């Protein structure tokens, strides 16, 4: 678990549905703040909008956006089945999307691997919101690097 320092006196929290309606506000995962520099986080949510590796059925590139939109309705305070408050126990932030070249699969694999490797140098875990099955290879390479 992330040890809080004096400068990190409060955990990163989603925007409350009682303050801003769930249909408004940030389009991030679970309405968490978007933080590109994730050094103070335990877990980074990382979008990988890529589907150039698919045949006949493109559209997986819209996955990260769709997951973020659906996650607006998550109730994030307390999970009774696990008796936990996930966003109080871990620092979680949405790190945005990796920019991928939709016209060059090899270049995109390198871009994903480089971004994930750099991010894993700063956080304990990445939760990837993706695209097609191609994204698994560079993510596994990044994990293997660490």
Question: Can you name each region flagged by the protein language model?
Answer:
Residues 2-146:
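Metal-dependent C-N hydrolase catalytic cores
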């Amino acid at each position: 678990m992330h040890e809080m320092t004096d400068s990190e006196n409060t955990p990163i929290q989603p925007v409350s549905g009682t303050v801003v309606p769930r249909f408004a506000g940030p389009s991030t995962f679970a309405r968490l703040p978007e933080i590109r520099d994730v050094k103070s986080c335990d877990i980074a949510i990382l979008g990988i909008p890529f589907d150039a590796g698919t045949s006949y059925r493109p559209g997986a590139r819209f996955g990260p956006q769709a997951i973020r939109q659906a996650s607006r309705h998550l109730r994030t305070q307390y999970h009774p089945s696990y008796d936990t408050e996930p966003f109080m126990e871990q620092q979680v932030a949405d790190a945005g999307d990796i920019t991928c070249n939709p016209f060059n699969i090899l270049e995109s694999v390198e871009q994903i691997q480089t971004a994930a490797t750099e991010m894993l140098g700063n956080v304990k875990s990445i939760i990837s919101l993706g695209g097609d099955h191609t994204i698994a290879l560079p993510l596994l390479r990044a994990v293997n690097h660490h």
